[in-house]
Amino acid sequence: MIEPLLCGIVLGLIPVTLLGLFVAAWNQYRRGGSALGG
């Protein structure tokens, strides 16, 4: 069985990690260092 605390930590970490990656990619895109030609 998965512990409720561990399950909560995982469910809380996944969105934060995705948000962090999105923000990092957005910052690179705004700097013009993106391969998308922005």
From Swiss-Prot:
Keyword set, alphabetical order: Electron transport, Membrane, Photosynthesis, Thylakoid, Transmembrane, Transmembrane helix, Transport
Native source species: Parasynechococcus marenigrum (strain WH8102)
Membrane topology field: Single-pass membrane protein
InterPro entries: Cyt_6/f_cplx_su5 (IPR003683), Cyt_6/f_cplx_su5_sf (IPR036099)
Domain of life assignment: Bacteria
Transmembrane segments: 5-25
Subunit structure: The 4 large subunits of the cytochrome b6-f complex are cytochrome b6, subunit IV (17 kDa polypeptide, PetD), cytochrome f and the Rieske protein, while the 4 small subunits are PetG, PetL, PetM and PetN. The complex functions as a dimer.
Descriptive protein name: Cytochrome b6-f complex subunit 5
Localisation: Cellular thylakoid membrane
An annotated GO BP: cytochrome complex assembly
Pfam family, one: PetG
GO MF annotation terms: electron transporter, transferring electrons within cytochrome b6/f complex of photosystem II activity
Gene name of the record: petG
Function: Component of the cytochrome b6-f complex, which mediates electron transfer between photosystem II (PSII) and photosystem I (PSI), cyclic electron flow around PSI, and state transitions. PetG is required for either the stability or assembly of the cytochrome b6-f complex.
Cellular component terms (Gene Ontology): cytochrome b6f complex; plasma membrane-derived thylakoid membrane
HAMAP family reported in the protein's UniProt record: Cytb6_f_PetG
Protein family membership: Belongs to the PetG family.
